[in-house]
Amino acid sequence: MGNIHIQTKSKEYDVYVGKESLSHLTTIVQNMQPSVSNIMIISDEAVASLHLQTVVDALQIDQKVFSFVVPSGEKEKSFENFYAAHTSALENKLDRNSLIVALGGGMIGDLAGFVAASFMRGIRFVQVPTTLLAHDSAVGGKVAINHPLGKNMIGAFHQPEAVVYHTPFLQSLPEKEWRSGYAEVIKHALIGDVKLYHWLKEEVQTLADLRDEKLIHILTKAIPVKANIVAQDETEKGVRAHLNFGHTLGHALEKELGYGNITHGDGVAVGMLFAIFLSEQVYKVNLAYEEMKQWFLKYGYPKMPSDLSVERLVGLMKQDKKANAGTIHMVLMQEYGVVNVVSISDETVHIALEAFQKDMV
């Protein structure tokens, strides 16, 4: 098992990664000061049916433990469920010394974290991720819900007390969720750990290789990339925006295709390829785009849909949180391991997207 220490200006905490990580949960709760009064576990139907009782049983404590379960899917990261969670918290007498446990993937981590950030102006929470994708979202304190006009538009920065990454929970994931999470692993490697990138190319020939010791190795290498960036820039005023590599187009694809019709990781994978495609033009460098494209396709990542309106995508990219005064800002790659946030004109993005779309056919 590998423990990773996270340090930000507002909080320090540990990420527990391994096959026995859940055994730490009781100790984590018992060591909190002031003492935890009661616990609310927030989960979704799919995860709760598999793992909720396991977590309840692992909590060897006297305090009351209750659960709030929402339907599964990104569209459930909504104001309605956020409000309903607050109602449940009030009905079950949560107070300022209570604890919320986020049991699930990124959707649940975001929703539960934002409930924790806002209930009585902020209470403690612990992340218990159940997906590979959540290795990214569970660390760093960004919590949010979606608005019909944009993803993660209503939220806060609220760091967890701990992250308990119990890897056996991941074994029930369908292949599309392994692929989705692996995209964020690739992202961390490309922007911050070139050695990990080369290791992935050698050691992960198929998604089935993302298991056991290789999985733990990947998590203990990818999470520190994010941790190091968050330590420098907790509230995304500077370098933390580098973590959005691939997300400008990725989020636009999610919005245009409809949440749930493309996974977050599939969108980010297409977005990273486009960022590399555009970076070669902007920086006049060779980033081996063709080789990267074939590598991504090998894992089953989708191509850019040929029937999507480039004009609509450009409009959605202008709604991205990095956009400034209506100008698109994208994270582009100067070389492997070196990225920058760059202002790009609508025309440049439009021309590049059209060329990229044709190349992906």
UniProtKB/Swiss-Prot annotation:
One of its GO terms (molecular function) is nucleotide binding. GO terms for biological process: amino acid biosynthetic process; aromatic amino acid family biosynthetic process; chorismate biosynthetic process. NAD(+) binds at S72, G73, E74, K75, E76, K77, T130, T131, K142, K151. Transmembrane segments: none annotated. It is found in: Cytoplasm. Its EC number is 4.2.3.4. Keywords: Amino-acid biosynthesis, Aromatic amino acid biosynthesis, Cobalt, Cytoplasm, Lyase, Metal-binding, NAD, Nucleotide-binding, Zinc. Its cofactor is Co(2+); Zn(2+); NAD(+). Pathway: Metabolic intermediate biosynthesis; chorismate biosynthesis; chorismate from D-erythrose 4-phosphate and phosphoenolpyruvate: step 2/7. Zn(2+) binds at E184, H247, H264. CDD domains: DHQS. Binds 1 divalent metal cation per subunit. Can use either Co(2+) or Zn(2+). Catalyzes the conversion of 3-deoxy-D-arabino-heptulosonate 7-phosphate (DAHP) to dehydroquinate (DHQ). Belongs to the sugar phosphate cyclases superfamily. Dehydroquinate synthase family. This is 3-dehydroquinate synthase. The gene is aroB.
